[in-house]
Amino acid sequence: MTAYLLHDELIFPHPEYADPDGLLAIGGDLSPDRLILAYKSGIFPWYNHKPILWWSPSKRPLIFPRLFKMSRSLYQTLKKDIYRVSFDKDFVTVIKGCATAPRKDSTGTWITEEMIEAYTLLHKLGFAHSVEVWFNDKIVGGLYGISIGRAFFGESMFTLMKDASKVAISCLVEHLILNNFYFIDCQITNKHLIRLGAYEIPRSVFLILLKEAVQKETLTNKWDRDFEFTSKTAKFLKEKLIPR
């Protein structure tokens, strides 16, 4: 199927019209209104060079917060209080860290300057959030994503020290459990996400869950939290996670 060509009008075709690879539409812009509409519709942008490509894969990996997998090694890392974790303290450093951090399975980045500007604006509007992992006074890992209703859309994460990105998502999961979030939308499946507990579900089921989640109140205020002792997160998750 040919991808839908977007114009100035804020509209997307239904995700079920995506091609077998998940490509749904081409063009448009990264304005806050269009991005929020996309995420609420089960669609996300992913491209290296213009035009902007919009996707809605036929299968969607979700992490349900209480089904997050905390491995024994991650539990031990959290217990050691090696890192300090904060939310929304330095969004720009985190998104640029995700854009520039070396990755074994990639030679480039899809996080362009245009994307950085667009998501930084969403952060200022209270929809995009960052998790920073600190070692001494340096950010050594983190993640960022979008929050709408009680759905969190994970965009990217990075790590410069052992388990730093896993520590970030652990603290995020604690926050999501405390605030009754439905899921983390991981967008595209990979082995790392599966190890963290992601379930791959059909798009049709995802859209049903999404519709309910985004109708809830959005926490658009700054997520101003500090985790000075990640050992407390380890204890919390051990008590709250459902064994698998």
From Swiss-Prot:
Reactions the enzyme catalyzes: N-terminal L-lysyl-[protein] + L-leucyl-tRNA(Leu) = N-terminal L-leucyl-L-lysyl-[protein] + tRNA(Leu) + H(+); N-terminal L-arginyl-[protein] + L-leucyl-tRNA(Leu) = N-terminal L-leucyl-L-arginyl-[protein] + tRNA(Leu) + H(+); L-phenylalanyl-tRNA(Phe) + an N-terminal L-alpha-aminoacyl-[protein] = an N-terminal L-phenylalanyl-L-alpha-aminoacyl-[protein] + tRNA(Phe)
Gene: aat
Homology family: Belongs to the L/F-transferase family.
Function: Functions in the N-end rule pathway of protein degradation where it conjugates Leu, Phe and, less efficiently, Met from aminoacyl-tRNAs to the N-termini of proteins containing an N-terminal arginine or lysine.
One BP term from GO: protein catabolic process
InterPro entries: Acyl_CoA_acyltransferase, Leu/Phe-tRNA_Trfase, Leu/Phe-tRNA_Trfase_C, Leu/Phe-tRNA_Trfase_N
Enzyme class: transferase
EC number(s) recorded for this UniProt protein: 2.3.2.6
Keyword Cytoplasm belongs to the record: yes
Molecular function per GO: leucyl-tRNA--protein transferase activity
Top-rank lineage group of the source organism: Bacteria
PANTHER family hit by this protein: LEUCYL/PHENYLALANYL-TRNA--PROTEIN TRANSFERASE (PTHR30098), LEUCYL_PHENYLALANYL-TRNA--PROTEIN TRANSFERASE (PTHR30098:SF2)
NCBIfam families: aat
GO cellular component terms, semicolon-separated: cytoplasm
Keyword Iron recorded: no
Name of this protein: Leucyl/phenylalanyl-tRNA--protein transferase
Subcellular compartments: Cytoplasm
Primary localization class, coarse: cytoplasm
